Curated annotation (Swiss-Prot):
InterPro entries xref list: Amidase, Amidase_CS, Amidase_dom, AS_sf, GatA
Role noted for this protein: Allows the formation of correctly charged Gln-tRNA(Gln) through the transamidation of misacylated Glu-tRNA(Gln) in organisms which lack glutaminyl-tRNA synthetase. The reaction takes place in the presence of glutamine and ATP through an activated gamma-phospho-Glu-tRNA(Gln).
Reactions catalysed according to its record: L-glutamyl-tRNA(Gln) + L-glutamine + ATP + H2O = L-glutaminyl-tRNA(Gln) + L-glutamate + ADP + phosphate + H(+)
E.C. numbers: 6.3.5.7
Assembly and oligomerization: Heterotrimer of A, B and C subunits.
Active site: residue positions: K78 (charge relay system), S153 (charge relay system), S177 (acyl-ester intermediate)
Matching SUPFAM superfamilies: Amidase signature (AS) enzymes
PROSITE patterns, per the entry: AMIDASES
Top enzyme category: ligase
One Gene Ontology CC term in the entry: glutamyl-tRNA(Gln) amidotransferase complex
Full protein name: Glutamyl-tRNA(Gln) amidotransferase subunit A
Keywords: ATP-binding, Ligase, Nucleotide-binding, Protein biosynthesis
């Protein structure tokens, strides 16, 4: 068994007992990256020297009896999360050479834990996309089948964890950007409640929807990482002051008698038969564990996708107005006057999908159309929130498929934005309502992973992790991606 194939909690045990050093663990992962990265293209930047320095710091912490849960554990950070002194590009030409002067709060918290940062992961440009094909630099491949996408926008982080390039990774989720790639790559991915994890240092896409969360190899690891990154931050005005529990303490609670809601709206048109069957079998596992399965309905979820794309694009058009080439970011070499400089810099710096969403958002916010689009989308948002509140009066969690399909072929949907947007049909409603949700692997369809989404009430991450852990223990998903080869 190679060190790089171990989980966070397995590595933690070995490190704390001093059976291996953080430097040995780090070298194992760096070798793994050299072996598989040319095949999957998950990383924008590899920070080898910094990683080895951090490993020495971790070994000192362990030697001095100061070890924490994540001391010496290697991580990869999505490249829209600020890392001081390390290039943060958002996979865009606009920020190709941007080096932040500060760390995001989540990065600061992880560094205080003693983690080892191995590099930054590829994403759809400015986190806009569902396949990681919109990156200005490279297309990340799915470790299960190199001709397929890993999902998006956090496809680099998901592929890196699936391929054992890191013990865990951070991503961001605006409409499914952690859960959908986790589903397509066969790993665990969690989007916490809006406000639980600080957004300070996350490059904004849609500020009322964005949330940072972890990708891990199992549910226990997810709870450990959430312990480290969750909690109030005065630097983020949307961060919520609540007492933070130890999320690992929920894992082993019995789920007998728990009410699990199944909404027919999450099994509608567009779902692949293989995905539907796999998820239905997964729901049967909960029944066997003594949980009560309850049919529920969330009717307004049907309108979640159009509402999401109006709200997210409107917020993006406002957030991305700051990239004008003056203070930082790409600046055009040839221009006639100030206005031409703005236009040319933005034209050259942004990719097609980003431009599409800026135009969509600007249109939705324009005076003649504000009421017809943006205002109406906000009303739908309220109706969706109310739907979930009513549903949670009858059940404790809601389960269903994370994605309507398994990983699709690279290039299959690039010329059909609507087909691409439909990849998020089961995930966007969770962001619209600000709820927490997790995707865990629940089987294979056509040899590719299928994700089960578990949605909870606001700040009920403990319950979600409990249900996910119970399933993981009962089902034991142990399939591994074969397309990348190597010792596992």
């Amino acid at each position: 068994m190679e060190l790089y194939s171990l989980t966070v909690h397995e590595l933690k045990e070995l490190l704390h007992k001093r059976e291996v050093s953080a430097q040995e663990v780090t070298k194992s992962y760096l070798e793994r990256i050299k072996e598989v990265e040319p095949k999957i293209d998950a990383l924008v930047t590899i920070t080898e020297e910094f990683a080895l320095e951090r490993a020495k710091v971790a070994d000192e912490m362990i030697k001095n009896g100061e070890a924490k849960d994540l001391t010496g554990i290697p991580v990869i950070i999505k490249d829209n999360i600020s890392t001081e002194g390390i290039r943060t590009t958002c996979s865009s030409k606009m920020l190709e050479n941007y080096i932040p002067p500060y760390n995001a709060t989540v990065v600061e918290r992880l560094l205080n834990e003693g983690v080892v940062i191995l590099g930054k992961s590829n994403l759809d440009e400015f986190a806009m996309g569902s396949s990681t094909e919109n990156s200005a630099f490279k297309t990340t491949k799915n470790p299960w089948d190199l001709s397929r996408v890993p999902g998006g926008s956090s496809g680099g982080s998901a592929a890196a964890v699936a391929a054992d390039e890191a013990a865990f990774a951070l991503g961001s989720d605006t409409g499914g950007s952690i859960r959908q790639p986790a589903s397509l790559c066969g790993v665990v991915g969690m989007k916490p409640t809006y406000g639980l994890v600080s957004r300070y240092g996350l490059v904004a896409f849609a500020s009322s929807l964005d949330q940072i969360g972890p990708f891990t190899k199992d549910v226990t690891d997810c709870a450990i990482v959430l312990n480290a990154i969750a909690g109030h931050d005065p630097m983020d005005s949307t961060s919520v002051k609540i007492e933070k529990p130890d999320y690992t303490s929920y894992l082993k609670e019995d789920i007998k008698g728990l009410r699990i809601g199944v909404a027919k709206e999450f099994f509608g048109a567009g779902i692949e038969e293989g995905v539907k069957e796999t998820v239905e079998k997964a729901i049967k596992v909960f029944e066997d564990l003594g949980a009560e399965i309850i049919d529920i309905s969330v009717p307004y979820v049907e309108y979640a996708l159009p509402a999401y794309y109006i709200i997210a694009s409107a917020e993006a058009s406002s957030n991305l107005a700051r990239y004008d080439g003056i203070r930082y970011g790409h600046i055009a070499k040839n221009y006639e006057d100030l206005v031409d400089m703005y236009m040319t810099s933005r034209s050259e710096g942004f990719g097609k999908e980003v431009k599409r969403r800026i135009m969509l958002g600007t249109y939705a916010l324009s005076s003649g159309y504000y009421d017809a689009y943006y205002k109406k989308a906000l009303k739908v948002r309220t109706l969706i929130k109310n739907d979930f509140e009513r549903a949670f009066e009858k059940c404790d969690v809601i389960v269903g498929p994370t994605s309507p399909t398994v990983a699709f072929k690279i290039g299959e949907r690039t010329n059909d934005p609507l087909a691409m947007y439909l990849a998020d049909i089961y995930t966007v409603s969770v962001n619209i309502a600000g709820l927490p949700a997790i995707s865990i692997p629940c089987g294979l369809s056509e040899g590719l992973p299928v994700g089960l989404q578990i949605i909870g009430k606001h700040f009920d991450e403990g319950r979600i992790l409990n249900v996910a852990y119970a399933f993981e223990k009962a089902y034991k998903f142990d399939a591994k991606p074969q397309a990348i080869g190597g010792e596992r």
